Amino acid sequence: MQETALLERESAGTGNAPVRTDWTREEIAALFDLPFTELLFRAAEVHRAHHRAGEVQLCTLLSIKTGGCPEDCGYCSQSVKADSGVEATKLMEVQKVLQSAAQAKDNGSKRFCMGAAWRNPKDRDMPAIISMIKGVREMGMETCMTLGMLTPSQAAQLADAGLDYYNHNIDTSPERYEEVITTRTFADRLQTLDNVRNAGINVCSGGIVGMGETRADRVGFVHALATLEQHPESVPVNALVPIKGTVLGDMLADTPLAKIDDIEFVRTVAVARITMPLSMVRLSAGRESMSEATQALCFMAGANSIFTGDKLLTAANAGDDADAAMFKRLGLKPMEGEEPMRAMKSVGGCSGGCAA
């Protein structure tokens, strides 16, 4: 009876029902426990109620400053704690960044994301960052930055420059978090998300699965995002790319059974779609090792955004040509027009899951 009640309450979040931010862990766990085909059916219903079926947003991610990060994230090859062979670089010149953005636009990307391996940006770097944002926007592309933690003042500067999105992932569940990173707290991450939201910038926040976590951790990860006062406009779901020389990469090389299987990854995408119906759910790192069949299941489960191009920061990624061929085989097309949450904000009709 209790499971039935939970699933009946969960169904209130489907279709055109109000967006919920009061999900319980029990409800989310019940979704994960559904028969796989039933979960996909429910996720597809939610997706079609809020998004255009068959359209997938194309984004490009560029590392504008690689390596040398003082954080100890166990998955990251750019940490100074990792023995990954990644060499630290200086911040890219603005013109080179804009050249990369122009190429991404020519390849069909609508959003250009720029990432720097910093704990937080220094004030001396802000003028160059602002020039990058303005230059990319002048091309008619959406902009996203991921620079580490932000102060309210820095968030305001990025907002004034016209930044559309800021990415700051929560990585995993609050309980698992300290096993992955110790140099920045879970609360620190939430504070940066608050600073971004308060500055009027759209939030991009997700995490990584396949780090040896349990399903309970995946439940906690989705719960942490789905119960934010306002859902992230974008939710990237990464599958860990185990890199030699990183803590987690070396751990999983020795314990391959700790890796997440494809069906469980698709389940995570589906539960994210059901609990955050208006958000863009993005397939991010790890996609290059997924079969087209697995990716097709992810699209059926509600994923409607991908990173395209040959590289994501330091990890390999499916290239533009491979993605174009996959889109043709699956009958998908690049997304046009505004995302649902942004469109609702522009007409003043957003409630429950959108930013003010």
Swiss-Prot record:
Residue ranges annotated for the Radical SAM core domain, each copy included: 54-278
Residue positions binding [2Fe-2S] cluster: 113, 144, 204, 282
SMART domains linked to this entry: BATS (SM00876), Elp3 (SM00729)
Enzyme class name: transferase
Residues involved in [4Fe-4S] cluster binding: 69, 73, 76
GO process terms (BP): biotin biosynthetic process
Gene3D superfamilies xrefs: Aldolase class I (3.20.20.70)
Oligomer status and interactors: Homodimer.
Protein's UniProt name: Biotin synthase
Originating species: Novosphingobium aromaticivorans (strain ATCC 700278 / DSM 12444 / CCUG 56034 / CIP 105152 / NBRC 16084 / F199)
Taxonomy of the source species: Bacteria, Pseudomonadati, Pseudomonadota, Alphaproteobacteria, Sphingomonadales
Gene for this chain: bioB
